[in-house]
Each structure stands twice: as structure tokens, then as C-alpha cells.
């Protein structure tokens, strides 16, 4: 029997009635909540949408949602307090519309203040930036190579049809960056945040560019250097284990692929001033950046979400309007931008499928079920944010005035 109201129901988990009442504001989709005693409660919006089910294993989940907001609920998932047969469907439902279900559950002030303090302590000065990057990217090259495509690219691909391979779509993204930047054969370009060297290899091999790539991840530097040596491109590509703020000289162009998100809001002016200083007069930089919708900016900037706590400590996304303001304040001109959020949704879904297909091999490296739940939560939450338009990804091209 499916229940649609808590009226007359006894022995409900603490705060469940309050949570269920708030969920009745859902406009689209359907959510079933199965309690430990077998009772199933259903909320259904008037409009069609994702259909999801949540199985509650720890009755304290609802108290944590009220007390701690989104982070409390996500923490409970990592700890096995609740589960769902289709995490992607649940995330699609949660992020549907102009707001998220979590907006009604902001958490208590002291909990919010504590998480903001933790986030502040992870701000990206030079020392902390290296720690923050290592936290994520130094999980191991073998780990990432299991579920990324052959290019070892950990950023959004650019799909044309959605049917092509991830490798082909990643190469299309690289091509777009060079095209938008306007780099010509023989030019010397700077890549701020070179990852595992995929873009640098493409730029040198396919577009005859010289590339200087910067990273503060020891693991990435090792992999990228070996990759370029194997490709016979060491005369064209140089990698440095160096903070972007310490680079000197000027370049014919700059590429930066989803590195800005790790900079931290305090250092956005420094980042764009560095871009300006490193460009030759009249030269362009094309920056691939994840953005949070303008309508979500106030809620987002004043909180700490799951991604900031567990995946990218110290990270912060800009809103499109804020991003353009920062660029202009640095004395750079916005030339154009290309948005392709649906491609990121598809990229994340491909990663999710491959990660889970390869889970036995990932587990053999020492990663446990809690890590699996964390990674799946991260991939599906991000995918849903792009699918619903709460987040987008842009290749924004800026120029240094002559």
C-alpha cells in the first residue's frame, strides 16, 4: 500500500512528517520514501518528471536533513543511512526546476557556520592550493585511467551528436579551444592546469604549437611528462610543477580547462590579472569554466555543498554575470563564449557507467564501498545539475587589448 499523507500514521521517524510536508511542494516527478518498517510514502508533482525511490535504513536521516541540510543528508548516504535503486533518477528529481529540493532544508545556523569555517580554512593560498589539488588528483593515475577515456581527460567533452565516442568528443573540445584562441602553427601557448597532458599533446601534435603546461599535482606531472616523451614531443612541450601565480613571460595564447573552479573566489582577481600579464598584447585566452546559474548564485555562494566538502576542497564556481565582471575588472575584453552544458551531463553519465563497470578493479586498489558511494554521489549530482541548467560549462575567450 502506498501512502500519500502522514495523517493518522504513528511511530514515524523523528521529523519525517515535517520533511514529507515540505516535499509536497514538488511540482514535477515522483518520489517514494520507504521506511524501515515497510511503509512507503509517495509525493507526486502535477507535471511529469523523474521517478525515484529512497529506502531509509536509519530513521535519524530526517533529523539530519532538518539539522544539517543537504550535507547532512549526503553524509547519511555515505554512511549507509539511506539508499536508492537509481541514484541518477534521484539526483535528476532533486535538481529539477529553478530550485533544488534542498533549498527548503538549509540546516541550522551553527552547522552552516561550521562548514563555512572549514571551507574558509581550505582557501587557496599557495600552500593550501597544493594540498587541495593533491587531495583530489593524487588519488593515483591508475585510478583515473580505469574510467577516463584514452585521452585521460578529466573535464567536459564537446559532443556534436551524443553518439560519438568520449575520446572523439574530448578531441573536439581540444580543437575548439585552439580555434577559439586563434593560435597559429608555431605559436607558443601557456596551459594553466595541464592535467595529464591531453590538451598539450593534441596542440603540439595536431596543431604544431609549442606548449608550456603548469600543474601543482606531482602525479599529473609524472604522467604528463612520460606521455609527451612517449609521443616524441618533448621538443615542443614543457611541463612545470608550479603555481600559476609564479609564471613569468608572455605567450601567444593561453588555454585553461576547468582549473578556474579550484582557484577560490578570493583569488579570482589574481587569476585574471595573471592571464592578462601572461598574454602578449592582442593575444587571446580561451578558458573552459563551469558556472552556476545566475539565479542560484546567492544560495550557492553562501553555503557549502557536497562537492566542496568531499571532492574539491576550496573550490568555487562563478555565475556567468560574476565571471564577466571579474574578467572586465582585470582589463580583459570578452570576445565570445560557447556554452555546452548538455555535453557535460553526457560526459558525467559516461564516466559514471565506466566507473561502475570497472568497480571490481577500483576496489582491488583499496577503495571501499563508502568511496564508491561518494564518487557516485558526486558524478550523479553534477550530471543532474547540468541536465537541469543549474550549472553550465563555457569556453569563454578573452583578449588582452593592444
Q: Each predicted region: which residue ranges?
A:
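Conserved class I S-adenosyl-L-methionine
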Residues: 185-193
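Feature captures hydrophobic
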Residues: 1-164, 168-170, 176, 183
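Conserved SAM-binding loop of SAM-dependent methyltransferases across substrates and taxa
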Residues: 196-207
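A short acidic, Gly/Pro-enriched loop at the edge of an enzyme's catalytic core
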Residues: 245-254
